[in-house]
Regions:
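A conserved acidic beta->alpha catalytic loop
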Residues: 27, 34, 42-51, 90
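Conserved nucleotide-sugar donor-binding catalytic segment
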Residues: 79, 138-188
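Acidic helix N-cap motif at the loop->helix transition within catalytic regions
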Residues: 19-22, 47-55, 94, 98
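N-proximal low-complexity "stem/linker" segments adjacent to membrane-targeting elements
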Residues: 1-30
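Glycine-rich, basic loop-to-helix element that forms the pyrophosphate-binding segment
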Residues: 65-81
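Short aromatic/hydrophobic "clamp" motif used to bind/position activated sugar donors
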Residues: 86
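Cell-envelope/extracellular polymer assembly enzymes that use nucleotide-activated donors
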Residues: 6-9, 37, 185
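Conserved donor NDP-sugar-binding/catalytic core segment of glycosyltransferases
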Residues: 94, 98-132
Length: 188
């Protein structure tokens, strides 16, 4: 690769996700990405989430405090992020091996790109693929859609989307009044 690796910051919002967050963290830390900042924003969980987070002290930054929900947690994490490339990964989602290397390489070699999105798979707790129809639909639209299509349907998978800090500074924070479509609103 000719350009240097950009620093990537991943923010994970969490609340009472002790059963899943360890796998999420492992999927991020196992990426082997050379310049990674990982921030977990926990909403003062009452389950074992904080115990799980303590196991990763020194390998990520985590804060456990009350928040106003998922979007507030994401925004708090993005405010303290130092990466050139930003993303958020929910506490029950996983990155496939090599994902961040592919993202970093793409951003390094295409400095004009403001954001990047890719395909994803949706799996259950036993790693069985679910929602295949929706995933196929979104992945198909990725190849042919444009901004006009995005105004009609959200074909962008949040967990596979990354953007530059400059785009974040231009667009601002996610809209806290939206609880389920904040990502779609952000892409537009």
């Amino acid at each position: 690769m000719s350009a240097r690796w950009p620093r990537i910051t991943i923010v994970t919002p969490s609340y009472n996700q002790g059963a899943f967050i360890g796998q999420t963290i492992e999927s991020v830390l196992a990426q082997g990405y050379p310049d990674l900042e990982y921030i977990v924003m926990d909403g003062a969980s009452t389950d074992n989430t904080v115990e799980v987070l303590r196991q990763y002290d020194g390998r990520l930054t985590w804060i456990s405090e009350r928040d106003r929900g998922q979007v507030d947690a994401i925004n708090k994490g993005l405010r303290i992020a130092t990466g050139e490339v930003l993303a958020y990964l929910n506490s029950d989602d996983l990155y496939l091996p090599g994902a961040l290397l592919a993202v970093g390489r793409r951003f390094a070699n295409q400095p004009e790109s403001a954001w990047l999105t890719g395909r994803c798979r949706v799996v259950d707790q036993d790693n069985r693929e679910i929602r295949k129809g929706l995933t196929h639909y979104k992945n198909t639209w990725l190849r042919v859609a444009n901004y006009q299509t995005l105004q009609i349907t959200n074909f962008v998978s949040q967990m596979a989307t990354f953007w530059r800090r400059e785009a974040y500074q231009r667009v601002g924070e996610l809209n806290e009044s939206l609880h389920y479509v904040m990502d779609w609103d952000y892409w537009m």
